[in-house]
Amino acid sequence: MEKMPKIALLRWDADQISDVLMKLETLPGNSTNPDSYPFDVALVHVKGANMDTVEVNPCQELLDEYIRVCKELAAQGVKAITTSCGFNAFYQEALAAAVPEVVFTSSLLQVPFAQTIVGKNGKVAILTANANDLTEEHLARANITNRENVLVYSMHEQPEWSRVYSDPNGPFDLDAVANEVVGVLRKGLEEHPDIGAVVFECTDLPPFASRVREELGLPVF
């Protein structure tokens, strides 16, 4: 019998992953690519988890399913549970309270840490897949209580990235997306040269982190 990994990642329902997202998953660094990790991670599809229930309209039904899956994973020996989408910050408090294992639903949980290291005179830039869906509630549930030095930048208006929403099963240029990621943050840095760190909300963006570090000289979380 194959031994269950100690870390599990909750990902979208297998029937709800578009061709564009599948292409992003081929990149090392993407949260759902097994090659992103130097150790075994259980990648677990969760029924009902999709663009709507995770990003746009979080709901009790998905929370209930998350809790059920987390408890099942814990019974199999999993000790830490994360997810494949930063918008799952919405479920952080409830999930952490419902299961005894360590739960870290979102990269947004790193924002308070980033705020600390840039100091009171620096700013933290959050780069999100879609700022229209990233609410104050998401930030609050990620324990981002101080918004004074937090800036939010979005990919949703970038021509290539917008295909995630407008043409999810059509062609998708990964090189163009990389350029868009750097471009959005470069513009942000020009407007706010005191930006000292970047946090990617979206777990499809880490494959492009090295470009940001190399070209803009910023740490990326």
Q: For the regions a protein language model found, what residue spans apply to each?
A:
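Glycine-rich, highly charged phosphate/nucleotide-binding loops
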Residues: 55-72, 176-184
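Short, acidic/small-residue loops that bind anionic groups at enzyme active sites
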Residues: 94-118, 213-221
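Non-catalytic positions within long, well-ordered alpha-helices that form the structural scaffold/packing
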Residues: 71-77, 115, 189-191
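N-terminal glycine-rich anion-binding loop in soluble enzyme alpha/beta folds
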Residues: 1-61, 130-133, 139-172
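Hydrophobic, well-structured mid-protein blocks that either form specific transmembrane helices
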Residues: 107-138
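Charge-patterned, long linear interaction tracts outside catalytic cores
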Residues: 176-210
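Gly/Ser/Thr-rich loops at beta-strand to alpha-helix junctions
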Residues: 13-16, 80-92, 107-110, 129-133, ...
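N-terminal active-site wall of soluble small-molecule enzyme domains
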Residues: 60, 64-69, 87-94, 98
